[in-house]
Amino acid sequence: MGVVTVPESNKQSVAAKRAFRPSSSIRHTPQWPVSDVTSDLTIEVGSATFSLHKFPLVSRSGRIRKLVLESKDTNLNLAAVPGGSESFELAAKFCYGVGVQYNSSNIAALRCVAHYLEMTEDLSEKNLEARTEAYLKDSIFNDISNSITVLHSCERLLPVAEEINLVGRLVNAIAVNACKEQLASGLLKLDQSFSCGVPETAKPCDWWGRSLPILKLDFFQRVLSAMKSKGLNHDIISDILMSYARKSLQIIREPNLVKSDSDLQRKQRIVLEAVVGLLPTQANKSSIPISFLSSLLKTAIGSGTSVSCRSDLERRISHLLDQAILEDILIPANIGAMYDTDSVQRIFSMFLNLDECEYRDDDDDEEDAVDESEMAMYDFEGAESPKQSSIFKVSKLMDSYLAEVALDSSLPPSKFIALAELLPDHARVVCDGLYRAVDIFLKVHPHMKDSERYRLCKTVSCKKLSQDASSHAAQNERLPVQIAVQVLFYEQTRLKNAMTSGGGTGGSNQSQFFLFPNRSGSGMASGAISPRDNYASVRRENRELRLEVARMRMRLTDLEKDHVSMKRDFVKPQSRRRRYGMLRKLSRGLNKLNAIVLRFRSSQSVASSGKKHTEEKTNSERRFMFQKRRCHSVS
């Protein structure tokens, strides 16, 4: 027989018992041809030994011919054959005239072996090199799926595959065919737009994009770079990158396993940095979801990637911050606190620093088609403008984030204060969410410095608190005294404005009804009461409200005096018992003021119930109540 292949452990040379009889035609059989000529050449390839004949090999292989002439030895060692013993066996069968079946799995190895053994047309017509080249051009380069398979097989054939430019040609073929698929898909969609009821086809990459993740990182990078240079759609590139990242980044699936293996963590870090470097440059216009970018950032921080890689991800997330949810920005920290607030602070800062032109880029192509009158009615800085609505969404996201990280007892107050102070004042319409987060932080961190406590509470705009939040803040003992006084002041100002807008001529009845919609039993809401009675009822209610405002103003004056005296006392050294006594004293004063507010609300309900009293009786009763409360006021 012509060849014997054995493992290295049992390596032995067995001579052919029959000689080789040349054949002018190639036999389409995988078996070796029977020959009566004894083998006269032994070739070792890796762990296998081949007992062959010189004539069929030297007639087609230039390298074997040179080795036989130079060494004049019957034993040759070809340890550097691309593809190992399996590839050499196929090449040897080709030399013996045995038909070799080409496919996408072995064509790259055969092409590299033909180059290594120098099986060119100079030695024999239709040699292995020419035949493999013809198969590549006819069946591989024009099919994107086959090109990916062959390129994957080239990973174990380096550097020979690079020397013959097989890798470069395959990369270019994949990129060109991908662009052709994109063009064909676009033309098909255009054709379908003229017909009705025809479903849209899938994306061009749906059937071959899943094959790209089998490539190693360097080949994958070259393919994606070639696709970008050929003009492939960024959405398709994004889909390919997301598929590759999910299959290649094990840290996303098993973070604990990766952290325990330093070598695996290093490899994952290299893959992650490469994926981030291949992301489309226009992140704000790409189809990459923010959840994917967030997972990459969490992985980057956990695996210790470069600063530039993390900064790039933070910048991309900032462009899509108005689409984020709380889970997207809850980034775990490696050491110290539970969450990485520094990264989140940089993301929000970059969002605020975005140029206004970036918000208007999406509308540049549509401005010519929009009527000028409609554009004149559109206020870019209004509450419904894209920029302002995005800021409102981001402010709600920030409040939710602050409420979550406030539960971390190891978070330094300075970092929490920096986050609370980050957004501008116009970003929030109502500060209830921020107040809730601040209150949680004060409860979890009871030993804060007074200066830090006051600075943190200053971030809450008291005039933007709702009525319920103001009532809670007025009785909140964790807030500094100055903040509590501000809350009461703005609450009194709010009531004063309500009274001012409610008084006046009959033309203000409509606004007064809007301010007090619950008074359905009053003369304004009743159509059976005459205009004269209605006017008298309104005047009576106005007088009652003015009296209540006057009482609250006097009570507020007393509280301000208490505040001034307390500030003077705090400057001097004093015992903790005395300080707590003053706080309790002020708390009792605030509770009494809250009782005044409740009586004020009850007076409204009494006025709306239709009870009619004479002005003399009402004034005397009110005066008596006022004098009684003054006797119990806090000095």
Curated annotation (Swiss-Prot):
NPH3 domain mapped to chain residues: 206-494
BTB domain location is: 39-104
- Where in the sequence is Phosphotyrosine found? Y435
**Compositionally biased tracts (Basic and acidic residues):** 612-624
Biased composition (Basic residues) is annotated at 625-635
What InterPro entries does the annotation carry? BTB/POZ_dom, NPH3/RPT2-like, NPH3_dom, SKP1/BTB/POZ_sf
Annotated region described as Disordered, given as residue ranges: 604-635
Phosphoprotein as a keyword? yes
Among its keywords, does the record have Phosphoprotein? Answer: yes
Sorted alphabetically, the keyword list is:
Phosphoprotein, Ubl conjugation pathway
Pfam families found in the cross-reference section: BTB, NPH3
Task: Output the superkingdom of the source species.
Answer: Eukaryota
GO biological process annotation, one example: protein ubiquitination
Q: In which pathway does it act?
A: Protein modification; protein ubiquitination
Describe the task this protein carries out.
Answer: May act as a substrate-specific adapter of an E3 ubiquitin-protein ligase complex (CUL3-RBX1-BTB) which mediates the ubiquitination and subsequent proteasomal degradation of target proteins.
Q: What is known of its domains?
A: The BTB/POZ domain mediates the interaction with some component of ubiquitin ligase complexes.
What does the similarity note say? Belongs to the NPH3 family.
Identify this protein by name.
BTB/POZ domain-containing protein SETH6
